[in-house]
Structures are given as structure tokens and as C-alpha cells.
């Protein structure tokens, strides 16, 4: 969130209207999405694979047959059941749906907005944890990672003791650093939060590309929630996230969910994807192999320092991130310059793992820039 006023280039809000809009909202910059037409788009951690033609046609028929004149019905129950099977939801746990993970994060902030509540998360991390907390009027505390992007155990435990957060977010893997944190440290944080009376949200947005999941530990804790999305599964355009955890806890969060928050189109597309999860598993395997190839190429590249990745992105440090970003853009490749997001990310670019030919173009372009 920014401290300077932004109206996205339009005329200023009239004073008679401005007094009805929160000042902190007026001081924000809207979330900026880079124009991507004509570029190799490797800036948003999307799955670059499109559905095979036969599956596209089948999905089109399914969506075309929907009664879009009706509100969503029992198909959302079927989707919850299908996701529970897909995820391996443990006994004693429940699952709720969100219009993407962003909505789930907002619902968590809303449900946990008790007087004096604090949200805690490691930094650098996903920007929506802080943005959602502040928009809901909650205090946000960020705890810096170590220089190699690991959880700082001592700092995290001290922050939990001092601030007693209502919500603690742990991304597994983390965005934008792409790494999986040490499980022993995570469990120490989870135990500390239990001792001081808050909730922990494990964010597994990048689970299809990771070597480990928290799902088997979920049933061991009555204060831990696990959040996932179908965006990295291959459905970023569908906007569907889901939250799992102890039944009683999920039931409370679900009370603040708007009715019909998942459209019939989103629901049917997600069910279709789960029916063909073997195709999406194949795509994820290709991306994991391409990630390894990209990492090898970056390690061999003069001036590039890549960091380990368990996601569909690679964080790399270069001598001049701004120059490299602009150079890639001039060569038709769009990545994310994250160097301004946090001091630990100085001169870092976040590269999404793309199709083989896209990765080839990005590797060649970056090699030319750094040579």
C-alpha cells in the first residue's frame, strides 16, 4: 500500500465526495497490472499451458449448457466434495470456497477483526496479507526473513509473543522468494501461536510445484487453516480458492462469506478441471522440469544469482534489476521487477517459468543483457 494519493491518472475526487471515502483508501495506489499484449508474459506465475483443443471444446459445451439465469446451486457442494477428494482433506476438517485466494484473505481479516487484533506475516511476502489487514482496520506486523530468505525463528517467535497475532500467515512456498521454509521452524511458530491464542494460515498457492505439503499435519492442530488456489493449477482466469481446516473453525469463517460468491461458470470450470486433473498434473510436471532447466541456465550465467525454487517462479539477483527488466522488456519478455518491494529483494527479478520456447527466449535475452 502506498502513502501517496493516486487516482489512476483521472481527475481528482471532488471534495464534497472525498469526505465520504476513507482517507487511507484515497492515499493508496491501485494494484497495477502491467500491459502484456505482444510480450512473452512471464510476470504473474500463471500456468502457460492452454487446454488441448478437444478439452477446450468439451468445456465450451459444458459452460454453454449452464443455466446462467439461476443463482449457483448444489454444484458448489459437488465442487467442495471434489476438492476435498483432490486435496486429501483429513477427517474432522471442512472446506470453504472463495473467489480466489484474495477473497479468502479478506474474509479471514473480516472474521478476525476483534478489537486490537494484529496480523503477522514474514516479509517479503504476498502483498495481500498486509493490504487486506489494513483495509479491515487491523494492525499489520511484518517480520523480515533472513538474508537467504529463510524464516528468522527468533524474530518470528519474539513477534508472536509481543503482538499475540489473531492471524499469522505462512506461505508454503513463499511468494516472491519461491522457497519452502524449514518445517521445524514452522512448527515452532505454529506452537507459539497456539500458546498465545491465534490462528495460523498456511498458504499453499504454489502446491502443484512444491515437494512438500502441510495437508497431513492439518488435523493435528485446531488453530491452523490451509489455503490453496486453482490459479497455479491452470485456472487463473477462473478465480477459485479454497480454505481447509477444523470444521468448527471453517464454519465461523464461512459465516462472513457472501452468498453465491462462486459463479456457476467458475464452479463448472473447476469441476471440469478436476475431472481432467491428469492433464494438469502433466502440465505441472513439464513446468517443474523447465524450472530445473531455467535454474541451471541462470547458475551458469555471469552476473546472475538465482535462489532455490519450489514454485513456478525463480527469484534471481542481477547487478541492476531496473536495467535488466527494461532490457528484457525491450526484447519482448515481461517479468516482474520486485527489487522495490523490500530491502532484502535489492536488484531481484521474479521470473515465471513458462513454456520451453518462452524460457529459451528469456534465457537468451537475459544472457545478452548480462554479458
From Swiss-Prot:
Cofactor(s) the record lists: pyridoxal 5'-phosphate
UniProt keyword terms in alphabetical order: Amino-acid biosynthesis, Aminotransferase, Histidine biosynthesis, Pyridoxal phosphate, Transferase
GO molecular function: histidinol-phosphate transaminase activity; pyridoxal phosphate binding
Amino-acid biosynthesis recorded as keyword: yes
Metabolic or biological pathway, per its Swiss-Prot or TrEMBL entry: Amino-acid biosynthesis; L-histidine biosynthesis; L-histidine from 5-phospho-alpha-D-ribose 1-diphosphate: step 7/9
Catalytic activity: L-histidinol phosphate + 2-oxoglutarate = 3-(imidazol-4-yl)-2-oxopropyl phosphate + L-glutamate
Biological processes annotated in GO: L-histidine biosynthetic process
Record PTM N6-(pyridoxal phosphate)lysine, positions in chain: 232
The EC number(s) this enzyme carries: 2.6.1.9
EC class name: transferase
Self-association and partners: Homodimer.
Similarity section: Belongs to the class-II pyridoxal-phosphate-dependent aminotransferase family. Histidinol-phosphate aminotransferase subfamily.
Name under which the protein is recorded: Histidinol-phosphate aminotransferase
Originating species: Methylibium petroleiphilum (strain ATCC BAA-1232 / LMG 22953 / PM1)
Amino acid at each position: 500500500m502506498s502513502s501517496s494519493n493516486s487516482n489512476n491518472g483521472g481527475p481528482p475526487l471532488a471534495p464534497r465526495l472525498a469526505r465520504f471515502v476513507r482517507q487511507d483508501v484515497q492515499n493508496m495506489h491501485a494494484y497495477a497490472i502491467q500491459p502484456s499484449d505482444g510480450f512473452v508474459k512471464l510476470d504473474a506465475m500463471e500456468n502457460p499451458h492452454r487446454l488441448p483443443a478437444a478439452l477446450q471444446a468439451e468445456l465450451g459445451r459444458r459452460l454453454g449448457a449452464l443455466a446462467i439465469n439461476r443463482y449457483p446451486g448444489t454444484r458448489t457442494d459437488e465442487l467442495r466434495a471434489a476438492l476435498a477428494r483432490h486435496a486429501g482433506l483429513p477427517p474432522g476438517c471442512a472446506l470453504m470456497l472463495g473467489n480466489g485466494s484474495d477473497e479468502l484473505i479478506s474474509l479471514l481479516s473480516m472474521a478476525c477483526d476483534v478489537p486490537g487484533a494484529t496480523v503477522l506475516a514474514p516479509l517479503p511476502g504476498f502483498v495481500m496479507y498486509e493490504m487486506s489487514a489494513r483495509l479491515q482496520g487491523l494492525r499489520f506486523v511484518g517480520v523480515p526473513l533472513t538474508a537467504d530468505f529463510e524464516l528468522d525463528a527468533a524474530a518470528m517467535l519474539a513477534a508472536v509473543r509481543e503482538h499475540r497475532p489473531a492471524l499469522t500467515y505462512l506461505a508454503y512456498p513463499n511468494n516472491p522468494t519461491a522457497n519452502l521454509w524449514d518445517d521445524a521452524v514452522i512448527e515452532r511458530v505454529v506452537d507459539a501461536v497456539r500458546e498465545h491464542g491465534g490462528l495460523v494460515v498456511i498458504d499453499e498457492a504454489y502446491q502443484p510445484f512444491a515437494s512438500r505439503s502441510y495437508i497431513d499435519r492439518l488435523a493435528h492442530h485446531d488453530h491452523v487453516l490451509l489455503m490453496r488456489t486453482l490459479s497455479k493449477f491452470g485456472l487463473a482466469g477462473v478465480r477459485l480458492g479454497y480454505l481447509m481446516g477444523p470444521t468448527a473453525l471453517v464454519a465461523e469463517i464461512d459465516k462472513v462469506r457472501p452468498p453465491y460468491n462462486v459463479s456457476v461458470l467458475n464452479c463448472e470450470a473447476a469441476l471440469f478441471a478436476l475431472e481432467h486433473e491428469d492433464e494438469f498434473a502433466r502440465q505441472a510436471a513439464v513446468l517443474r522440469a523447465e524450472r530445473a532447466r531455467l535454474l541451471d541456465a541462470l547458475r551458469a550465467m555471469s552476473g546472475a544469482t538465482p535462489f532455490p525454487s519450489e514454485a513456478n517462479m525463480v527469484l534471481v539477483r542481477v547487478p541492476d534489476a531496473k536495467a535488466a527488466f527494461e532490457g528484457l522488456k525491450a526484447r519482448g519478455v515481461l517479468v516482474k521487477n520486485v527489487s522495490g518491494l523490500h530491502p532484502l529483494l535489492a536488484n531481484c527479478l521474479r521470473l515465471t517459468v513458462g513454456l520451453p520456447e518462452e524460457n529459451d527466449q528469456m534465457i537468451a535475452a537475459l544472457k545478452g543483457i548480462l554479458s
